[in-house]
Amino acid sequence: MANGILVIDKSAGWTSQDVAAKLRGVFHERRVGHGGTLDPMATGVLPIFIGRATRAAEFLESAEKEYIAGLRLGTVTDTQDTSGTVLETHPVTVTRADVQAALQRFLGPIEQIPPMYSAIKIGGQKLYELARQGKEVERKPRSITIHELELLEGEGTEYVLRVRCSKGTYVRTLCHDLGSALSCGGCMSSLRRTRAGSFTLSQAVTMQQVLDFAAEHDPQELLMPVDAVFSVHPPLIVTLGQAAKLKNGAQVRDWQFRPGTYRVYAEDGEFLLLGRVENGLLTTIKSFFEVNTLAT
């Protein structure tokens, strides 16, 4: 049975669900999910969670992401990117210095109105379904954080940005809003995710590489262990006796434990759970041990 994480370098044209569906067949495993949707036109880091590792996907969805984005000024579209229908065009007279100055206005905590072409549900319907019917509904602004926003290159109408942001950020909306701030309109012309949580492009493989490898080898050799998603947290080793208690749902008290969030391992190396220590008491946030290893 396959269990682990595979970081895919998604190609343009694939939906995130397309990738997950294809890998269900490769690994013969029904439980396959991803850690944060990438639009079809976007490329780059798409962490895939397989088998028991799907229990960890929610933790990556909430992690910060990093992107390289193309900004096209002077063009406004219904999808806020170049895949959509052009609604407006405007002359562009801004300079690189103007763009650089505008970026500063979007740094830090900001409010962002989600685009109509998104999977957010309002009244039980996804926004993109309403948008395809020609309907537009009021969306409430969402609080996001732009940690870094760097102008890498560009002039005239085409610019390249590096964006490090919180969960829930729509980079195409950021491009649209930048265009509005510059009074010429704008949209996203390209998007490449370079990091999701602790996962980077250096760890990623393409779907074709996966398929080629699986044709001659066991594809499970490509998988990273589930605890890789928690690498930002320090490890905590517990005795086999303490591990048995944790597996049976109990808390474990040890005054040598320091406060914090930990990757918890049994002393034999088995990854047990993500846990939190307060006042010497270790409690489970999410468990990942195999059910057939439960202590009796």
PLM region spans:
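Accessory RNA 3′-end/elbow-binding domains used by RNA modification enzymes
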Residues: 1-9, 17-42, 97, 181-296
